[in-house]
Amino acid sequence: MDMRKEQYESERPSAAFPFESRYVDVLGHRIHYIEEGRGAPVLFVHGNPTSSYLWRNVLPAVATDTRGRGIALDLPGFGRSGKLADGNYSLDLYYRVLEGFIENLGLKDLVLVLHDWGGPLGMMYAVRHRDNVKAVALMETFLWDTSWKDYGKFKTVFKLFRSPIGYLMIQVMNFFVNKILPGSVIRTENMTREVMDHYRQPFPTAASRKPVRVFPQLIPIEGRPETSRLFIEEIEDNLRRLDIPVLWIKATPGAIITSNTEYRLVALAARMPRLAVKEFGSGLHYLQEEDPRRLAELIAEWIKGQNLHNLPSETDNILFDAA
């Protein structure tokens, strides 16, 4: 057992969330966010059913190591951000809020760190605001119209999520938070009661869980829904114009990029010549709960390697480098 792994196993990642809560009004929505550090901004964007809490053990380390300003927001309906009275959550809403958040905080020359639904949302910002994004780090996300064959053993459950039964499963039973979230982490011992209580806290009622149900319905699968397909197509059509460093952090066995879907990543690399792939090691979907120290190291070392913050270069941008 190597020293890093031994140290990790002796120190379970902290469940604490010791950040000052900050709020900003974006398009009439009360958006919660956290930040730490000074310098060039590194913006962390979560997916379903998480929040800025997901980044609690990653953001401070990245901000310190890169001498940057780490920022993580909660999308509407998640974390401590406000919920929509009409429950009308949509991909367009989430994008406009992300775009407005960046504008309201005056964030310039961004590095984006994106997970799950944060991937399409952040990449849409990158292709529409190429002059304001310096680099993008991605993990366990998608930038393509998916296929049912991509889902493997989860095909049935995601079909149910997109059916009327999804209301019972996700909003009444809280299945996504209670089962999918902890079940998508290999190191289950990390998903302690305290951690799960943090993740459950924003969703005390069936109505409050509406955004958790909406995201599975929005996933572009074989061209549906059309709004999501068009959203993804705009990103795909502009990837070659995005002349910035892009990092993909790949876990084994992974959940979105697996041995059966790695062809997706190869196809993406063909469109993005500045894409680097770094191996995370053992993990499923929520890598932030697997080994946040490892994740922070990969992100920070890569950022420094691009010399974005005028720091000494320590890494090379090489496709499928198993650093």
Where are these regions (language model features)?
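A short, Lys/Arg-enriched amphipathic alpha-helix followed by its capping loop at the start of a domain
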Residues: 57-68, 104
